[in-house]
Amino acid sequence: MANISGFGITRSLIHSFDPHGKHYRPTIKPTTGFSASADAERLHRSMKGPGTNELAIINILARRTNYERQEICQSYKSLYKQDLKDDLKSDTSGDFRKVLCQLIVDTPYMLAKSLYYAMKGLGTNDRVLIEIFTTLWNDEMKAVADAYKQVLKDKGSEESERSLVTDMKKETCGDYEYALLSLVQAERDDIPILQLKAIPDKGVNSIINHELAEADAKDLYASGAGRVGTSERRITRVICNRTPYQLYLTSEIYFKMYGKTLLEHIESETSGDYRKLLVAVLRYAIDRPSLIAEWLHDSMAGLGTKDYALMRLLITRSEIDLQDIMDAYESIYGKSLLNAVKDDTSGDYRRTLCVLMGEIYNQQQ
């Protein structure tokens, strides 16, 4: 966590491969020949004097990784004794300003801020909690929890004991709270980084345990479908602690043993936000691109657009698996994600989101 970005140069490798060991496909990759100072100078020129070169800003910030954007911010501060965020805010407006500010903040802080607002005031936006906690692994969860303390400080909180966990406990209860805590406490099974790096050569079989998967399948059946009543804690301990690869294997074995999918079992034996969370964790392991495609569709469904959800999902997935999500979206909805976003957004905000998805704009457009 000593890197310039809270998640380091890349997200945890546990997100990098599908259940069969195939690399997920990002739309944003590290920039060849990257120079933070050169980008900082170009950004400064694009905002200097009358008028703003919005396309130049987009083509830099929306094509860089989060790690690169943090380096650009530091170079900008060093060169011009001014925060890049302040200059962007003074030169832009509306949703375009919002998405630029989301792009240049480090990822843990962006997610922590989303969680803060999800639990602020009356009611809780459980959709945000589920979308974020489902997609973080142990080291990332710790980084977000640390960033949450900084968000509280920035918002003027003087309660030294207040934290992500204390706020979450106030806003949730019962089995749902227990499951969230299982994720937030960052004690899920982990895989050594060298084993993750070896997946392309050795395959997923090198990091999964068939005996454990069979035992978990039996335990899950015994906790619900195979008894009167449901043991939610036993279900939670398996679903919220295993790696995605281990959960995928367990779901395969469960179907072979009982002729019913594990997902069907969870949906029939649980309810409410607790069910939504477990289903999301399981689907993240089984068919992640389709799950996140549905989240993106929901962010644009109905009257108005949930812009912060749309921004968060596109920004955070762009370096991991956004190309696979785009393919899943078109398969599910018969329309490209790119066109769906274009239909729901406008102007430079639209262009920024489209560049995150791989669209190319030249200076004449």
From Swiss-Prot:
Binding-site positions, Ca(2+) 3: 119, 121, 123, 171
Protein name: Annexin B22
The protein's assembly and partners: Homodimer.
Residues binding Ca(2+) 1, per UniProt: 47, 49, 51, 91
GO cellular component: cytoplasm; extracellular exosome; host cell; membrane; nucleus; plasma membrane; vesicle membrane
Residues bound to Ca(2+) 5: 169, 172, 177
Binding site for Ca(2+) 2: 52, 54
